């Protein structure tokens, strides 16, 4: 049976800014370990004091995406320059109950959330008498509810403006071109009233275009991070983890949950490399920071391809689904304008076979045209019509 024509595929929405310079914000209540996490993640020294709102202006940094494939390419080509992919991370000040109504630092915090493209939602599952909890007792499920409710409340406040505007045009001015926009925003409001995140709804391409005009907070992808004590992280047990997982399954099905320990990571950060490796081996654990970075990168729908040679090995960030000419444009706009072809090797093939010559001999070095969709880990050699004094090839 032939496929139906003009059927718009429904898929999870990629809502928000399109591009490669996207960032993940670290979100949570005060004193749950956000600044400590940011410090160990970026190896920076952002202030981390034991009182609410010590992080007023968001600290921003970028974190290298650790990749064994990139390390292999660097070792193989021994380039003069090496540039990995990076994840942009922002430490947002602690959000408190009532922020949507101006409590704490209120709407200033929510504007920082709005400026991010995805979120690390960090909750605390450790007891420490020296680190007070803004709500008194430690209860990460309650904390998840507080943050979730504030995001829903802010979206509900926001939706009325654009919905009223398009409703006037559609129903009163009889502007039929506004029907899709009106129907989409009505559906968004229904989701919010039912406490269903916008990201959990299925949207078609046209609806996504409309949603991308707005910055709904509940549309942003979320990775849930649970900050454990060093002891619980090492023994891989904590009484709150099953309850947190149950909350996520009910309220944000399919979202990723990653346990980590700020205290554990901070301890590793202060150790020399040989001592660190010995300690990890003795405890039978590994750091989860690389996993967190990779998960945040994927949450932004980002991936990267490599250009490699003796001059430079570089990972170029693109959005998933990028065609070859647009990927070439990440290097220089002339590469996109004068695109001829992309000569592509899979990095896995290159690692397995050992060098480019063997990839070519084994039929693993392919010429791809304008319709080729670049895949994560492609090693690409672009050919283009030279312009603006550039060389005819870039690798």
Curated annotation (Swiss-Prot):
**GO function terms (MF aspect):** ATP binding; ATP hydrolysis activity; GTP binding; metal ion binding; ribosomal large subunit binding
For Mg(2+), which residues are the binding ones? 35, 55
The protein's assembly and partners = Monomer.
Q: What is its main location?
A: cytoplasm
**What GO cellular component term, any one, is given?**
endoplasmic reticulum
Which PANTHER family does the record associate with it? Answer: OBG GTPASE FAMILY, OBG-LIKE ATPASE 1
Q: Where in the cell is it found?
A: Cytoplasm
- State the similarity comment: Belongs to the TRAFAC class OBG-HflX-like GTPase superfamily. OBG GTPase family. YchF/OLA1 subfamily.
OBG-type G domain location, by residue?
A: 22-280
Pfam families, A to Z: MMR_HSR1, YchF-GTPase_C
Reply yes or no: does the keyword Hydrolase apply: yes
Query: Is Transmembrane given among the entry's keywords?
Result: no
Tissue localization of expression is:
Expressed in the nervous system, pharyngeal muscles and intestine (at protein level).
Q: Which cofactor does it need?
A: Mg(2+)
Native species of this protein?
Caenorhabditis elegans
Protein name (Swiss-Prot/TrEMBL): Obg-like ATPase 1
GO annotations under biological process? behavioral response to starvation; thermosensory behavior; thermotaxis
Stretches assigned to the TGS domain: 301-384
Q: Where does ATP bind?
A: 31-36, 228
Query: What gene makes this protein?
Result: ola-1
């Amino acid at each position: 049976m032939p496929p139906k024509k003009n059927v718009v595929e429904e898929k999870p929405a990629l809502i928000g800014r399109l591009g490669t310079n996207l960032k993940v914000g670290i979100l949570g209540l005060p004193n749950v370990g956000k600044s400590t996490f940011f410090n160990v993640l970026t190896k920076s020294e952002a202030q981390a004091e034991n009182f609410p709102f010590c992080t007023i202006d968001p600290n921003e940094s970028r974190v290298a995406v650790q990749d064994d494939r990139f390390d292999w390419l660097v070792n193989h080509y021994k380039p003069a320059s090496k540039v990995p992919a990076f994840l942009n991370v922002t430490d947002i000040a602690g959000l408190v109950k009532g922020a949507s109504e101006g409590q704490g630092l209120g709407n200033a915090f929510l504007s920082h959330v709005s400026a991010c493209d995805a979120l690390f939602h960090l909750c605390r599952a450790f007891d420490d008498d020296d680190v007070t909890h803004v709500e008194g007792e430690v209860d990460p499920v309650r904390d998840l509810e507080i943050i979730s409710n504030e995001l829903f409340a802010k979206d509900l406040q926001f939706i009325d403006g654009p919905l009223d505007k398009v409703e006037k045009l559609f129903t009163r001015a009889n502007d039929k071109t506004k029907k899709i926009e009106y129907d989409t925003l009505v559906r968004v409001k229904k989701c919010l009233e039912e406490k269903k995140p916008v990201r959990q709804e299925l949207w078609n391409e046209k609806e996504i275009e409309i949603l991308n005009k707005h910055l709904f907070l509940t549309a942003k992808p979320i990775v849930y991070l649970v900050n454990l004590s060093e002891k619980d992280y090492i023994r891989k047990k904590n009484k709150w983890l099953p309850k947190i997982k149950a909350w996520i399954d009910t309220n944000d099905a399919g979202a990723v949950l990653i346990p980590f320990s700020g205290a554990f990571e901070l301890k590793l950060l202060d150790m020399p490399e040989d001592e660190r490796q010995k300690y990890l081996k003795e405890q039978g654990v590994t750091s989860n920071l690389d996993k967190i970075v990779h998960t945040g990168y994927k949450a932004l729908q980002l991936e990267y391809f490599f250009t490699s040679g003796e001059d430079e090995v570089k990972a170029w960030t693109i959005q998933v689904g990028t065609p070859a000419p647009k990927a070439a444009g990440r290097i220089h706009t002339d590469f996109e304008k004068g695109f001829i072809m992309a000569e592509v090797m899979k990095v896995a093939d290159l690692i397995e076979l050992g060098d480019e010559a063997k990839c070519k001999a084994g039929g693993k070095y392919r010429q791809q045209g304008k319709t080729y969709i670049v895949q994560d880990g492609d090693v690409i050699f672009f050919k283009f019509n030279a312009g603006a004094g550039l060389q005819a090839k870039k690798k």
